Regions:
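Flexible loop and strand-edge segments within Gram-negative outer membrane beta-barrel domains
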Residues: 22-24, 212-216, 227-239, 245-305, ...
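N-terminal periplasmic "start-of-domain" segments of outer-membrane beta-barrel proteins
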Residues: 33-64
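Extracytoplasmic beta-strand/coil segments of soluble accessory domains associated
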Residues: 70, 74-111
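Membrane-embedded beta-barrel scaffold of Gram-negative outer-membrane proteins
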Residues: 302-320, 434, 441-444, 470-530, ...
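Structural signature of Gram-negative outer-membrane beta-barrels, strongest in the C-terminal barrel
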Residues: 351-361, 365-502
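Gram-negative outer-membrane beta-barrel transporters
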Residues: 356-357, 394, 492-503, 522-605, ...
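C-terminal beta-signal and adjacent terminal beta-strands/loops
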Residues: 506, 600-607, 615-616, 623-672
Length: 672
């Protein structure tokens, strides 16, 4: 087809785009090195961010009493995690109440795709090999990036460790094992090797097993308290990553192979009226494999190139047996997804204060399933972004325009959703009013849309090929303050406050038909979100004692204005609390360190109807850890003890999906 030829030409012959000037632009290599340095450098980086961003990196991630990326994201403001029941349950993220489908998830710079249902289960990504987790509202503030990076309302970037060697050392080895409550065992291995000054590699692997069995209590319908044990929450998981890193004159490259294999049970809802009646024996098997590579080079002072490529294969087997759970129908389905992705981003630096960029992406997705009358859809997506950036020292401006072309095809004639062509803009600005005061005022506007997923369009009996895209419009105004002090007990202080207003239109939802066993997908809904995010971070020093503090707060009023005739018109949308916050306190003294963390989620409703029957009480948890590091010649040994949910808070993130109470864990790491 002609569009294929146009794509190839645009990917490899389009002249470069712009990013920020070379002084302000950071390669992934420099990012890694900076994030490993002291907090003074980290603070200086923070004040240059034009878009609202929250970062957890290095030792902060290491000290958190959490296993997965989803659990770590709970400490960011403006984030709601939907957790369907503890260990084995699905974990998805909702940022600023716009929905999980509007969150882009990137792994080492390339997006993790799921064309089938549009969401990524962040519970399957552990922190074992993670160096940095960043959350951006809107988009990253650098314009030298793939077009994909412009296509989401918000984005999560996970960056894994990059090998760093001291002196002439050629190998780093980190052997770890964790064990604790719920029969949890989690061994891991990280081996980093330096071939020469230009090429290095890393192998990271881990295995985890947990029974997922934990006690929980709640009040029954008759008012009596009862205790039950969470069933069918076991997980067996294996992750294996192999990465290579290389340097070339004026640039670098990296390549990675990733394999994830798991079997898990889905514990299902706990029915209050008859606890323990339904056994919930649903099982899921997953295999996720991808290989990806990236090349970045500064060919000329005025031109740089960033090229990415990826192939991914995902297999999912879901089994539900009504003989074990009478609330379900028999399901024994197998799904297979394939994805091919290629990207070329060009950066032109016209003047030190003016740069431009042009990025072209192509993505192909295919979905196969053993469903009756399945149409076997494929999707071709072309994204082209044009962006420009102006840096007048105290005033910085950015603007971008994203073009999206989506073409679906199916084996069944006339069953496809046709072709979509959309343009979506964004504008970002930041201004420093006073030269000597490290205070910045920032603002952004962004309009973006999401295509209906392949399930939304083509799932047998449920899909609707006539669905329209779902649009979001974002407005944000905020301030940032960042400063460091020398020879002072307060070493650094970072503050950011953002107020925002979002709209979601043509929201895609499931609605029942005349047959109660068949639902269909429709466009319905207008949601308005008004909110405030605030974060303050401090680094303190009292002699040999070092202390870091992080406070986050979120206020959100997310109203449903879908149906003016509804009694619940203008009510708070389900599962969005008005207030939420978190606290992280880290302390260290010589070879000892401790960490305390607190999470609070305020009152909310569990359904559209804002009535007492749907009211959910606030919940909060306290976690604490203590670690000691031993040095024996060239070997370091770190022992960590953790306690989660210290006061055994009984709570539910999602109605009828109880979370674990108090739990314990011991970690041992040997670093050679």
């Amino acid at each position: 087809r002609s569009w294929i030829l146009c794509l190839i030409l645009s990917l490899f012959t389009t002249l470069p785009a712009i990013s920020q000037s070379k002084v302000r632009h950071h390669t992934s290599l420099s990012d890694t090195l900076l994030k490993l340095k002291e907090v003074t450098i980290y603070s200086n980086r923070m004040q240059k961010k034009m878009s609202p961003v929250q970062i957890l990196s290095g030792k902060e991630l290491e000290k958190l009493n959490v296993y997965s990326v989803a659990d770590a994201l709970r400490y960011f403001s403006g984030v709601q995690i939907k957790d369907y029941g503890g260990i084995g349950g699905l974990k998805t993220v909702n940022i600023r109440s716009m929905g999980s489908h509007h969150v882009g998830v990137f792994y080492d710079g390339i997006e993790l795709g799921n064309a089938q249902n549009g969401v990524v289960d962040l519970g399957r990504f552990s922190l074992d090999n993670m160096e940095v987790i960043s959350l951006y509202n809107g988009q990253k503030s650098a314009i030298f990036q793939p077009a994909k990076d412009y296509s989401s309302a918000s984005a999560i970037y996970m960056q894994t460790r990059k090998p760093l060697f001291k002196g002439e050392k050629k190998n780093n080895l980190n052997i770890g094992v964790k064990g604790g409550s719920f029969s949890t065992i989690n061994p891991s291995l990280l081996w980093e090797h330096r071939f020469n000054e230009r090429i290095s590699s890393s192998i990271s692997t881990e295995y985890m097993y947990t029974s997922g069995r934990y006690k929980f209590t709640y009040a029954k319908k008759d008012g009596y308290d009862t205790t039950a044990v969470r069933q069918n929450g076991d997980v067996r998981m294996l992750r294996l990553e192999n990465a290579f890193f290389g340097k070339v004159p004026k640039g670098e490259w990296k390549a990675k192979a990733y394999l994830y294999n798991s079997e898990r049970g889905y514990p299902g809802a706990a029915v209050r009226e008859e606890p323990g009646k339904f056994r919930h024996q649903d099982r899921q098997w997953d295999t996720n494999l991808f290989v990806q590579g990236s090349f970045q080079n500064y060919f000329k002072p005025w031109y740089s190139l960033l090229a990415n490529g990826k192939y991914a294969y995902d297999y999912l087997h879901y089994l539900s047996d009504p003989r074990l759970d009478v609330t379900t129908m028999y399901v024994d389905n197998h799904y297979r997804q394939q994805e091919i992705y290629a990207s070329a981003a060009h950066l032109f630096t016209i003047y030190p204060w003016w740069s431009m960029s042009l990025s072209n992406d192509f993505q192909w997705n295919a979905l196969r399933a053993d469903l009756i009358d399945f149409v076997y859809p494929t999707r071709n997506t072309i994204l082209t972004s044009a962006a420009t950036s102006f840096d007048f020292n105290r005033l910085m401006l950015q603007a971008s325009l994203l073009y999206t072309h989506v073409d679906d095809n199916t084996r069944t004639k006339g069953a496809n959703a046709g072709t979509k062509n959309k343009y979506t803009p964004s504008v970002i600005a930041t201004w420093q009013p006073l030269t000597k005061l490290p205070l910045n005022v920032r603002a952004f506007y962004k309009k973006v849309f999401r295509m209906p997923t392949l399930n939304d369009l083509y799932y047998t009996f449920i899909g609707n090929k006539d669905l329209k895209p779902e649009y979001t419009t974002q407005y944000d105004v905020g301030i940032t303050f960042s400063h460091t002090w020398n020879n002072h007990w307060l070493k650094s202080l970072d503050l950011q406050i953002d107020g925002y207003y979002n709209e979601v239109d043509d929201k895609i939802i499931a609605m029942p038909t005349s047959n109660q066993f068949r639902w269909t997908m429709i466009n319905l809904g207008h949601v308005e979100i008004r909110g405030l995010d605030a974060a303050i971070r401090g680094e303190w020093g009292f002699g040999k004692v070092e202390l870091s503090t992080l406070f986050n707060y979120t206020y959100q009023k997310a109203q449903d204005f879908t149906d003016p005739t509804s009694e619940w018109y203008g009510g708070q949308i389900p599962y969005i609390p008005w207030h939420g916050g978190s606290i992280i306190l880290n302390g260290s003294y010589q070879t000892w360190s401790c960490n305390y963390s607190f999470i609070y989620t305020g009152e909310r409703y569990e359904a559209v109807a804002n009535i007492p029957e749907n009211y959910a009480q606030p919940w909060y948890t306290h976690d604490f850890s203590l670690s000691k590091t031993f040095q024996w010649e060239k070997t370091r040994i770190r022992v960590t003890a953790e306690i989660n949910n210290i006061f055994n808070q009984q709570y539910e993130v999602v109605q009828c999906y109880p979370m674990p109470g108090t739990s314990f864990k011991i970690k041992l790491n040997v670093m050679l």
